C-alpha cells in the first residue's frame, strides 16, 4: 500500500515539461517588465494591426459566414464545388462547403463554419476535425496585399503564396482522409442527411453579430499578445547581436505577420522566400491558440489540425522552393 501511494505521489508530481513551461512564462513576464516601454510599443503595433487589417478583413466575413451556415444558404450555393471537393477529401457537402469558405476567406472562417455544422448535428466529430484541419489557411487579402505587396513588394509572390497555401491544405486533407480509411471507424454521432434547405429567421442576424463580435475580439487579443511577445523577444535578440535568421525563425514560430515580415528582410532572398512559405503553412502559435479557443468549446481535438499544419509547413516551403 505504501509503495502504491509513493508511485501515485510520484505520478502526481511536477513533470519536467511543467517546469520548463513555468520557467518560460516567468522569463516572458520578466522580459516584459524589464522592457515595458518596448512591450507597450509593440502592443500598440498589435492593436493597430487589428484595427487596420484584422477587423476589416475578418469581422464582416465572420458575420456573413455565420448567416450562411445558420440559414443553410452556404451549403446550397457552394453545392457544385462542394460535391467534387467532398469526394476528394472524404467529406460531406456540408463540411466541404466549410472548407471552401475557409480557403476563400482564410482562418478562422472555415473552422468556425465546420464547428457550427457539427454543433447543429449536420456532421460528426471526426469529419469536423478533418474539415477544421484543412480549411485554416491565411486569407488571400493578407497573403497578396500584406505579405506580397507590402513585405516583398511583389504581388505575384503573394499570389504564389496563396496558391501554395491552398494546394498544401488540400494535400493535408487528402492525407488525413487516407489515414482515416486505414483506421477502424469509431462510432460517431448520427448526422442529418436531409437536402440543404434555406431558412431565414429574425433572430439569426443579431445572433450572428454577437458571435462574430465575440470571436473577432478574441482573435484580436491573441494577435496583440503575440505581437507584444514577438517584438519584445526580437529586441533581446538584437541586443545580443543574434543572427537575423534566428530572429526570423522564432518570429515565424510565434506569429505569421511578424514572421513573414522578418523573413522578407533577410539578405539571402531564396532562403527568405522558402522561410516565408513555411511561415504561411505553419501560421504561428497565435493562430493555433485561436483555433484552440474555437475547438475547445465543442471538445474538438486539435491533433488532426496540428498534423495538417506540419504537412502544410513542409508542402508550402517545398512549393516555394521549387517555383522561386
Task: Give the ranges of each region predicted by the language model.
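Alpha-helical membrane segments and immediately flanking helix-loop junctions
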Residues: 88-152, 250-267, 271-295
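N-terminal membrane topogenic signal
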Residues: 9-23
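Juxtamembrane boundary at the C-terminal end of a transmembrane helix
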Residues: 319-324
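Transmembrane helical segments that form the transport core of multi-pass membrane transport proteins
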Residues: 73, 205-280
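Selected transmembrane alpha-helices and immediately adjacent juxtamembrane segments
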Residues: 23-38, 43-55, 59-63, 67, ...
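Alpha-helical transmembrane segments of multi-pass membrane proteins, especially transporters
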Residues: 49, 98-103, 128-136, 157-169, ...
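Juxtamembrane inter-helical linkers in multi-pass membrane proteins
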Residues: 83-95, 99, 185-204, 251-252
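Membrane-core helix-loop-helix motifs of multi-pass transport proteins
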Residues: 117-179, 293-318
Amino acid at each position: 500500500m505504501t509503495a502504491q501511494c509513493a508511485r501515485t505521489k510520484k505520478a502526481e508530481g511536477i513533470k519536467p515539461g511543467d517546469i520548463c513551461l513555468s520557467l518560460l512564462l516567468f522569463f516572458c513576464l520578466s522580459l516584459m517588465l524589464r522592457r515595458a516601454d518596448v512591450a507597450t510599443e509593440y502592443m500598440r503595433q498589435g492593436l493597430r494591426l487589428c484595427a487596420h487589417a484584422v477587423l476589416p478583413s475578418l469581422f464582416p466575413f465572420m458575420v456573413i459566414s455565420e448567416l450562411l451556415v445558420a440559414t443553410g444558404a452556404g451549403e446550397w450555393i457552394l453545392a457544385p464545388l462542394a460535391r467534387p471537393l467532398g469526394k476528394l477529401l472524404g467529406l460531406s457537402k456540408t463540411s466541404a462547403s466549410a472548407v471552401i469558405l475557409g480557403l476563400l476567406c482564410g482562418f478562422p472562417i472555415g473552422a468556425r463554419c465546420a464547428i457550427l455544422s457539427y454543433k447543429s448535428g449536420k456532421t460528426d466529430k471526426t469529419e469536423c476535425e478533418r474539415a477544421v484541419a484543412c480549411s485554416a489557411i491565411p486569407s488571400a487579402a493578407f497573403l497578396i496585399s500584406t505579405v506580397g505587396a507590402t513585405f516583398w513588394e511583389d504581388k505575384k509572390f503573394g499570389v504564389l503564396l496563396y496558391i501554395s497555401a491552398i494546394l498544401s491544405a488540400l494535400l493535408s486533407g487528402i492525407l488525413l482522409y487516407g489515414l482515416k480509411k486505414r483506421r477502424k471507424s469509431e462510432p460517431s454521432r448520427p448526422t442529418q442527411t436531409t437536402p440543404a434547405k434555406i431558412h431565414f429567421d429574425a433572430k439569426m442576424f443579431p445572433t450572428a453579430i454577437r458571435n462574430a463580435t465575440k470571436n473577432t475580439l478574441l482573435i484580436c487579443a491573441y494577435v496583440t499578445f503575440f505581437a507584444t511577445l514577438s517584438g519584445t523577444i526580437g529586441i533581446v535578440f538584437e541586443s545580443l547581436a543574434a543572427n537575423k535568421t534566428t530572429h526570423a525563425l522564432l518570429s515565424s514560430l510565434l506569429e505569421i505577420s511578424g514572421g513573414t515580415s522578418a523573413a522578407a528582410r533577410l539578405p539571402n532572398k531564396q532562403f527568405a522566400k522558402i522561410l516565408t512559405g513555411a511561415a504561411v503553412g505553419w501560421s504561428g502559435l497565435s493562430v493555433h491558440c485561436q483555433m484552440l479557443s474555437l475547438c475547445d468549446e465543442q471538445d474538438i481535438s486539435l491533433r488532426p489540425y496540428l498534423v495538417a499544419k506540419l504537412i502544410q509547413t513542409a508542402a508550402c516551403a517545398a512549393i516555394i522552393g521549387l517555383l522561386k
